[in-house]
Amino acid sequence: MKFLKIAFGLALFGTHVNCMAVPPGAESVPVCKQIGVRKEVRSLTATEWQAYANAVAAAYNDKWIDWFGFYHSVVADTVHGSSQFLVFHRHFINSYEDILQRYNPAVMVPYWNMMIDFQNPANSAVLGSKYLGGNGVGAKGCVSSGVAGAWTLAYPKNHCLGRAYNNGTTISPWYSPEYVTSVLQRSDTYADLRAGIENSVHGAVHLGLNGDMSTMHSPTDPVFFLHHVNIDRLYAQWQAVKPATRTYMYDGVDSKNAPATVNDFITGTSTPVYQVMRLGYGNMCYTYDTIKAANGDASALVKRQPHKCIKRPSPATQQIIKQLPPKVLAQFYPAFANGPGHPLENEMVAISPLQPMAADACAVDFKAPPPNENMRGKMPFPSGLPDDWIKMQGSSVAEVRALEKSAYDMVEALNKANYLSPYMV
């Protein structure tokens, strides 16, 4: 992937940042000289994907995968169920990306927008043999295909990389783009966003894949990083909607229930929280294809090959959800109820669950099939998080159950409105 040079003072979070409140110390964090772009994994060319896979293989051979699993498990108690969740994992992912760039400086960690696969996650092309591999096989549930096929890990003890889908050969439904759009629009504070994302799509993916992904050494599964890059993308987009107030917004409590501040250190480091909060500064020398597109770079989400597996963005897809009854919009989509909304708080992208990977070199342009009319008014409810997982994460069972009820209420409201999600196939 090519790096883009950045002029001094370029605002990656948008164009209106003149009144940004910068905390003491943050003003001295230097602007990046080069910016990498993290892309959705389905949009990577064959060359880009192979470069990433090669770097991951090299990191595995040098035992870095074991190290990241070990490190995450050591600090897990303080970085989940608290304000550290988003900022710690932003720093953690960046450290992983730094390691991969030792093998290939052009590599950027892609994200997996797994929300579009929510109806039938196991059928996603991303979990296919060419990419991240699928369910575990055999008595030990070993992953045998994909970038991590036949991996043997040393942490916490010698074992194969394992997955055991939570519904046998399939995965129970995850959280939809419609739900994540609602979280982005209804989260007025950092603490709101952290809780809304951590206790929904975050947990659902870990538990859906199960195996090593359901443990605190989950970074040993390569899905972990694509999953958490997607979570970081959502955080970055939420910041970018109102950069003046959200870039350095950091509230809630830490793992000891003390008020969180931007001067807190990222767990396990000497890095203050404020140093990771503004993309394009310090060591956070990256942005996302979605943010570039929202800032006017129309080519950011469109492949340049003559034949395109992916065509984005789609104004038509983004308009579908805005046609819900006013009462539903007011309750779950306040930005749409009050106007057109910001494109970065609308996760209704034009990728289909049946989308081939761009790296598959489509012979012709891909045309997504229409959604299944038989599924109108039948959006599935996402799976709940079990009590033992919630407690392992250090979260409040009552808080999680309240968030789940909100998600179920949204699904029920959309079904009563006879809504047909474009991702129901």
PLM segments and residue spans:
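Fungal secretory targeting signals
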Residues: 1-24
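Intrinsically disordered, flexible peripheral segments
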Residues: 18-82, 87-425
